[in-house]
Structure formats: structure tokens, C-alpha cells
Amino acid sequence: MPTVNQLIRKPRIAPVKRNKVPALQANPQKRGVCTRVYTTTPKKPNSALRKVAKVRLTNGFEVIGYIPGEGHNLQEHSVVMIRGGRVKDLPGVRYHIIRGVLDTQGVKNRKQRRSKYGAKRPK
């Protein structure tokens, strides 16, 4: 434990906080246009074809967003809304595309956790 004199000479420094979603610029969501929609494979223990889209945001950032749920209608030039939230087994994917907003349709036949996938209440 340092003495008072040592702390006066060299004070404690707080660790630097790193922003995990810099492209949002302190906004909850951002709008963007898909420039490329494709599938990619996850990191080592997992195996799948994950659906992702490269999105050019309104502030000029170009980010990769994950498309959650089963099936989607996105293609190049689709206008999407993006939120923060990384996908742990896809390096470089730090954003999620919000389903049921703008050009993105909700997931069909979704019964549970509907609000997360933009699905309407079944009749």
C-alpha cells in the first residue's frame, strides 16, 4: 500500500473506459443502408452459417450487423435500424439489426419472445 507522499508524487490513474459501440455515437439506435448481405462462419467450437449484413450508417460509419431469427428479407439497399450488442462467436460483429423496423420484416410464426423479433401477436 503506498504512502501519502507516494500518492502525492504519483497519483492513482483510473482505467480508460473503452466504448464498445462507437458507431452509434451515444445514440440507442442508428439507421443505415445494407451494402452487402451474406453468411459467415463462427469461431472454433461452433459451426453454422450466420446471416450478417454490412451496413453504411447515416453518420458515415460502415459496420457489420447480425440478422437475428430464422429467415429474413434483407438485400442490398435495404434500409435497416441497428442497435448495439455483439455476437460472441462472430469476430467483428458488434451490432444487431432490429427486426420489424423499416425494411426488415419480423420473424414469421414466432410465438415466444415476439418483441425481440418484431412478430405480431398471433390471432
Curated annotation (Swiss-Prot):
Q: Which GO terms describe its cellular component?
A: small ribosomal subunit
Task: Tell me the protein's name.
Answer: Small ribosomal subunit protein uS12
- Gene3D superfamilies per UniProt: Nucleic acid-binding proteins
Q: Which NCBIfam families match?
A: rpsL_bact
Q: Metal-binding among the record's keywords?
A: no
Subunit arrangement?
Part of the 30S ribosomal subunit. Contacts proteins S8 and S17. May interact with IF1 in the 30S initiation complex.
Which BP terms in the Gene Ontology apply to this protein? translation
| InterPro entries noted in UniProt | NA-bd_OB-fold, Ribosomal_uS12, Ribosomal_uS12_bac
Q: Where are the transmembrane segments?
A: none
Q: Which UniProt keywords apply?
A: Methylation, Ribonucleoprotein, Ribosomal protein, RNA-binding, rRNA-binding, tRNA-binding
> Which organism's genome codes for this protein?
Brucella anthropi (strain ATCC 49188 / DSM 6882 / CCUG 24695 / JCM 21032 / LMG 3331 / NBRC 15819 / NCTC 12168 / Alc 37) (Ochrobactrum anthropi)
Encoding gene, per UniProt annotation:
rpsL
Q: Which residues form the signal peptide?
A: none
Q: Which family does it belong to?
A: Belongs to the universal ribosomal protein uS12 family.
User: In the record, what terms sit under GO molecular function?
Assistant: rRNA binding; structural constituent of ribosome; tRNA binding
